[in-house]
């Protein structure tokens, strides 16, 4: 996992998509035009967390290196240092795999 030169703010998380399988279990190769974007990724960077009503910092539950699942339309796609990444709020993450 390459270190990126970007620090997200507040409760935002930077995620790199994990490539989907290019072949089905039955051996059929899926063309790029038929592939859906994967909804699984690896956390690359995390912000410090959000603040509650009293102003107290609430740290983020996920950490760098976690493998996460997120919604189909979650996050904003960016390109940073030649890598396609997603920036999303922690609340867009549905869970940690493994």
Swiss-Prot record:
GO annotation, biological process: chaperone cofactor-dependent protein refolding
Transmembrane segments: none
Subcellular location: Cytoplasm
InterPro entries reported for this sequence: Chaperonin_GroES (IPR020818), Chaperonin_GroES_sf (IPR037124), Chaprnonin_Cpn10_CS (IPR018369), GroES-like_sf (IPR011032)
UniProt cross-references to SUPFAM superfamilies, sorted A to Z: GroES-like
Source organism superkingdom: Bacteria
Keyword Chaperone included in the entry's annotation: yes
Known role: Together with the chaperonin GroEL, plays an essential role in assisting protein folding. The GroEL-GroES system forms a nano-cage that allows encapsulation of the non-native substrate proteins and provides a physical environment optimized to promote and accelerate protein folding. GroES binds to the apical surface of the GroEL ring, thereby capping the opening of the GroEL channel.
Subunit structure: Heptamer of 7 subunits arranged in a ring. Interacts with the chaperonin GroEL.
Protein name in UniProt: Co-chaperonin GroES 1
Species this protein is from: Rhodopseudomonas palustris (strain ATCC BAA-98 / CGA009)
Lineage: Bacteria, Pseudomonadati, Pseudomonadota, Alphaproteobacteria, Hyphomicrobiales
